[in-house]
Regions:
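Short, structured segments at the rim of ligand-binding sites
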Residues: 1-415
């Protein structure tokens, strides 16, 4: 499937964003470990969270988590502490995404996990019965989801969990988000210093829980505000908390110097909202370390290129093990639009302002990656007509993305 996008002349809209996928998936695992009966409220309706809900309810085997990397990691730990044998499998791409570091860590704690096909990669056969816990050391620069998966099972282990992180710790806001949710459900879990986290052996408490809306989804609306030529544009996004524990709430500070002003307020019903308006761009070049907000990188890279702002972005090492190699994908697709990017050290992207000719009728490949589709869609403000291949990938995190764009005035034609 392919769609053609044309941007609206004016941008004035109020949008209800989807619930946070990151919070939903963590809350569901913790809720299950707590033995809760009523699901958390405002759970995300995206593919990844649907897969998580289905897997937690499924009684037969194997459990197909499709392309949901979060589910693969969190459920590997979850099923290790629950009785029975479960096989976790997924898409062809999922079977190429390494999971050996997490499996080795779980085995160190006593888990019984076998690789069904290829050593170090899914599918996994997990025989439950991990109960002891104890001390564990992990590199800090692995996926934060490995760390979160281990932390969340800590309270149900007899000895709890003491986790040491060595080297550079990346994506720390996601670890902090996990610790916050654990505490919200009654666990005692905290950093004891910059390298160590201690989780006490104290069972979770079933707790009514409401999930806030998604700051990652908000980033695409920030991009639209930055790129629209409408100087009077105004976007209101509902359900976003100013004091959010989501790491991607940093988006409002990131977009401030490139022309987007954020105002926090509550509407007449008391619902927290943000109002986005345009302001002058206050920089000629940008440098930023995305080590703590890797999921914002695609949006920000594309936005800066479209604005003609040279940049050097670091801390991108985790982008290579996401739904696709996002560094390579960004280089290939922005080249189609006339922006030759360069990679350095496997963790940096930079653009010096050089332009090349735009390919006629550019079609953006999405690589089974929802964030590629959503980050490139607003390019139609700059490139008059742009095409997106396999647009349905947005269902992974923001199922109603294209509907919301139509509501604000984008012309979207299925071809």
């Amino acid at each position: 499937m392919q769609i053609r996008l044309t941007a609206p002349l004016h941008l004035r809209h109020k949008t209800i964003l989807p619930a946070s996928k990151s919070i939903s998936n963590r809350a569901l695992i913790i809720h299950a470990l707590a033995g809760g009966k009523d699901l958390p409220k405002n759970v995300s309706d995206c593919d990844d969270t649907f897969v998580m809900v289905r897997a937690l309810m499924q009684t037969d085997d194997p459990i197909d988590i499709m392309a949901a990397g979060t589910a693969m990691r969190f459920l590997s730990a979850y099923w290790s502490v629950n009785e029975g044998t479960h096989t976790l499998t997924g898409t062809a791409r999922m079977k190429q995404r390494p999971i050996g570091i997490l499996v080795n860590a779980l085995r160190t704690l006593g888990a019984q996990i076998e690789y069904v096909e290829t050593e170090g990669y899914p599918p996994l056969r997990i025989s439950g019965g991990l109960h002891e816990g104890g001390r564990l050391s992990l590199p800090g620069d692995v996926s934060s989801q490995y760390i979160s998966a281990l932390l969340m099972i800590g309270p149900v282990l007899r000895k709890g969990l003491e986790l040491e992180l060595t080297g550079q710790v990346i994506s720390r806001p996601y670890i902090d988000l996990t610790l916050k949710l654990m505490k919200d459900f009654g666990a005692q879990a905290e950093w004891t210093d910059e390298r160590h986290i201690k989780v006490e052996p104290q069972p979770y408490r079933p707790t009514p829980y409401y999930i806030e809306n998604d700051w990652s989804a908000a980033s695409y609306w920030y991009e639209m505000m930055a790129l629209t030529p409408d100087k009077d544009a105004e976007i209101v996004l509902t359900g976003l908390f100013a004091d959010s524990a989501q790491g991607d709430s940093a988006v409002h500070g990131l977009f401030e110097p490139i022309g987007v002003h954020t105002e926090f307020f509550c509407d007449d019903d008391g619902i927290p909202c943000v109002r986005l308006t345009k302001q002058p761009i206050a920089t000629e070049r940008l440098e930023y370390d995305f080590v703590n907000q890797p999921d914002l990188a695609q949006t920000f890279v594309v936005t800066c290129a479209m604005l003609g702002l040279p940049f050097r972005f670091t801390g991108l090492q985790s982008l290579k093990i996401k739904e696709t190699d996002r560094i390579s994908a960004l280089i290939r697709e922005l080249d189609k639009l006339g922006y030759p990017l360069h990679e350095a050290c496997g963790s940096e992207l930079f653009w010096d302002g050089q332009r090349t000719e735009v390919r006629p009728h550019p079609a953006i490949d999405t690589y089974e990656d929802h964030r590629m589709a959503m980050a490139f869609a607003p390019c139609c403000f700059v490139v008059p007509e742009i095409y997106i291949n396999h647009p349905q990938v947005v269902s992974k995190s923001y199922p109603h993305y294209w509907d919301h764009l139509k509501e604000v005035g984008f012309e979207i034609t299925a071809l």
